[in-house]
Amino acid sequence: MIKAVRYCLTLLTALLILTTPTNSKVSDSVVYVQEPAPITLSLKPDYFSNITYSNEELECLALNIYFEAGVESTAGKLAVANVTINRKNSSDYPNTICGVVKEGKHYHDKRIDKRYPLRDRCQFSWYCDGLVDKPKKGRTWNTSLEVAEIALKKHYADILIDITDGSTHYHANWMEKYPSWAYTKKKMATIDRHIFYKSGKYR
């Protein structure tokens, strides 16, 4: 019963965070599909007019949300965004969103001067699973972009609420055997299909 109440409170918090007034300035390079979005935003002109972030940051965060929690609720998507941003703020990880998402071993193809992740040698499995990392156009991608955009704006405005309470790690709750690192960190929350853990130093 207590877990159910905590989950409901987490979901309500996520919805409250994502419906706070904001602007929509997603780059023209990102394609939206004209489908009904499950999240309705209340817009307020110039609310975040001084907040800036790059299109690359937006795409990296949206891709991480899409592949890690695309089928989950708004709370599940926001939780992945929180962990990504928490890692960026931690001295234990790269200090950029894309650096965090793409952290891991790479090889350099000198013929075309491009780096590729080594199979199963990265932090987020979708990035190095050998599959094409191209999202399918539709509602799931659109909402992932929307959550990423709002999370970035509120992060840089220092008003983003962290529903994972500082977590830097998570794993699926359906795993029969948890990763070894899970026993060395503090469990902070269970949101949708992931269990979240906290550790590390912060900048």
Predicted regions mapped to residue ranges:
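Bacterial extracytoplasmic/cell-wall-associated proteins, especially those involved in peptidoglycan
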Residues: 2, 25-203
